Amino acid sequence: MEKRVRKTPLNPEIISLGKCIEAIIKAKGLKTREVAHDADLDVENLRKYIKGKQEMKVSTMLKIAKSLGVSVADLFLLNTKD
């Protein structure tokens, strides 16, 4: 089976947002599956968001932020750059 290749490059801001979410998860000592459960998301989708492989809706950002105990604005203020 051939590996699928992305038609469009990953958006750097989306990747950065995912890194921030991952950093908050680690800083709070949480597990990805716990955050996914609390946000009522499939764990695989959350992993795609964290890796920047899938864009998310604003409603999904709200759920993730709530499950992390931060605001959506905090996700962008805490956004890490490479």
Predicted regions and their residues:
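A short, Lys/Arg-rich alpha-helix, primarily the initiator
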Residues: 2-29
